[in-house]
Amino acid sequence: MRNPFEHLLGRRAELEIRRFGDAGAFLAEVGSAASAPTLLLLGREIPEDAREGDRISAFVYLDSEARPLATTTMPKLTLGKVAFLRVSSVTAFGAFVDWGLPKELLVPSALQTQELQVGARHPIGLYLDDRGRLTGTMRVTEMLGTRSEGFEQDEWVDGEAWRKDPEIGVFVIVERAFVGLLPSHEPHALARGEAARFRVTNILPDGKMELSLRAPAHEQVEDDAEHVLAVLQRPGTPPVGDRSSPELVRDLFGLSKKAFKRAVGRLLKLGAVQLTAEGFVRAEKR
């Protein structure tokens, strides 16, 4: 029998309370007929002042008996999206991952691209299998868009560090739906799966996006200057200046050589540092 809520599975939907029962509230699609099918919202999730006819924003999924169920808890993943999820158990037929709901998400063995270990985090995509069940997959490359439609330069987006290429940079899962690149020249200390806010720095002719963890230079320089000064004031900081290697600058400050020079220029203007005869930057005594 076809699930009347299949088109809502894995999505957040605006639903309407039609009636109450011992188990909870029965919801139907807003504007549907009085005889329309309903799905259950468990009693513990019903707002205290809820009445028939009230609208509720809920996520629709299947319970352990494959019955459609509504929840006001928003999971970490919705249909067609990709996010890093933690493996909670491994069985002979697949692995279960924590996606924020009591019923964990199954990633069948056939959809795993590597052996999974309990506690590990991997990018998982959510889709409907041929039996209409919400299922996880590790085959996420084809689910992620590479064209940045809807994004603008200098817009801030949410992302998770995905794959690292020493020559190119870090590929980032952006807004759980797209792939962006944090170029190798951008300083960072991101671990795989680490979430961060990224700024879209460039949209290439082919629609791909380049990212940065930093604000535009004119906005970032104040924070960088404060950070550079704090590092220079630490005991044991080695001499550093304009002729220092980019690697040393990045190791000490987590900044590119260009950003470091901008910060030093700002500090010189403020009189917070001075240059030695050898060209090293030295913090003024406080």
What are the functions of these language-model segments?
Residues M1-R286:
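Single-stranded RNA-binding regions, centering on S1/OB-family and related RNA-binding modules
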